[in-house]
């Protein structure tokens, strides 16, 4: 079976977890890991897995892109550098899957809008944030039943699972997540809050989703819609589960979720890594299947 070759930029928590998932993919083959620190743990681990590495950033990868047939790149660095990375790689015809909150390209939350991206020939799609991937499906589950005037999501993650890149991007995280709660989740107004909890032992990712419906909530239909959506998410993140809810209080619908990871890199408490990396891998696989079938040919993009 032909596989589409990929590069990963950023050998931190997210990049390392993603590498483990891509290694199992039937249509994607990770061939490069890009970092900026020669001593990086993530680069060392990638080399042990037989992946080529460079510590010279994206510029260290560019000369090899065409020779090694790289067609998809995952950016797990920081919102500040993503635009430059994307420009350089898009110019060589490489499609970007953006795991930073840069959000240059359209938002992608697989169970809600993955299919919409097919056939649009986008060269950059944004995976929102871990908080977005965990909560937007729930907002969408309510908004597909009836209009949501306001949605507020709170993502609580363990301190140990949040690396330096994510910490530098907290403001971008909240802005990008709130934007996608509106655009993909379907809420008229969205708000996002992230809590980084330093407790030891580290706690599992928890997410609270509040939706205010415009009219009295149709409890039965909303409950059915939420359960159906949870099953969709579980297809690629089996540790996604409902802890409580939906709880109805007037026009407010509240759902409490917990996300356990597969333990590919950090232990299972780091469900925030899994929901992000599994969504990114799922998205890339869909594009890869189209390329293998001959329905999608990537063209260089001149910025």
Swiss-Prot record:
UniProt entry keywords in alphabetical sequence: Aromatic hydrocarbons catabolism, NAD, Oxidoreductase, Plasmid
InterPro entries referenced in this protein's UniProt entry, alphabetically: Acetaldehyde_dehydrogenase, Acetylaldehyde_DH_C, NAD(P)-bd_dom_sf, Semialdehyde_DH_NAD-bd
UniProt xrefs under SUPFAM superfamilies: Glyceraldehyde-3-phosphate dehydrogenase-like, C-terminal domain (SSF55347), NAD(P)-binding Rossmann-fold domains (SSF51735)
Enzyme class: oxidoreductase
Annotated SMART domains: Semialdhyde_dh
Catalytic activity: acetaldehyde + NAD(+) + CoA = acetyl-CoA + NADH + H(+)
Gene3D superfamilies, A to Z: Dihydrodipicolinate Reductase, domain 2 (3.30.360.10), NAD(P)-binding Rossmann-like Domain (3.40.50.720)
Taxonomic superkingdom: Bacteria
The enzyme's E.C. designation: 1.2.1.10
Family designation: Belongs to the acetaldehyde dehydrogenase family.
UniProt-recorded name of the protein: Acetaldehyde dehydrogenase 2
Organism: Burkholderia vietnamiensis (strain G4 / LMG 22486) (Burkholderia cepacia (strain R1808))
């Amino acid at each position: 079976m032909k596989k589409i070759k990929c590069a990963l930029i950023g050998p931190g928590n997210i990049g390392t977890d993603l590498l483990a998932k891509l290694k199992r993919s039937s249509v994607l083959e990770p061939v490069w890991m890009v970092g900026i620190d020669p001593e990086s743990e993530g680069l060392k681990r990638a080399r042990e897995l037989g992946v080529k590495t460079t510590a010279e950033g994206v510029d260290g990868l560019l000369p090899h892109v065409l020779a090694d047939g790289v067609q998809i790149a995952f950016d797990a660095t920081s919102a500040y550098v993503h635009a430059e990375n994307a420009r350089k790689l898009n110019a060589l015809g490489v499609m970007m899957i953006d795991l930073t909150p840069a959000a240059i390209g359209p938002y992608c939350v697989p169970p809600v809008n993955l299919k919409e991206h097919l056939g649009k020939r986008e060269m950059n799609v944004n995976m929102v944030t871990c908080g977005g991937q965990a909560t937007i499906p729930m907002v969408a589950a309510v908004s597909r039943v009836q209009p949501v005037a306001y949605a507020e999501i709170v993502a609580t993650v363990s301190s140990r699972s949040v690396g330096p890149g994510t910490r530098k991007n907290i403001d971008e995280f909240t802005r990008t997540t709130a934007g996608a709660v509106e655009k993909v989740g379907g809420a008229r107004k969205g708000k996002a809050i992230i809590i980084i909890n330093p407790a030891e032992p580290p706690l599992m990712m928890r997410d609270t989703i509040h939706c205010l419906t415009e009219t009295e909530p149709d409890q039965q239909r909303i409950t059915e819609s939420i359960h159906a959506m949870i099953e969709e998410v579980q297809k690629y993140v089996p540790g996604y589960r409902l802890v409580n809810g939906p709880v109805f209080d007037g026009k407010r619908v509240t759902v409490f979720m917990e996300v356990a990871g597969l333990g590919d890199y950090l232990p299972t408490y780091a469900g925030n890594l899994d929901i992000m990396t599994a969504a990114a891998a799922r998205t890339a696989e869909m594009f890869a299947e189209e390329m293998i079938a001959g329905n999608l040919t990537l063209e260089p993009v001149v910025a």
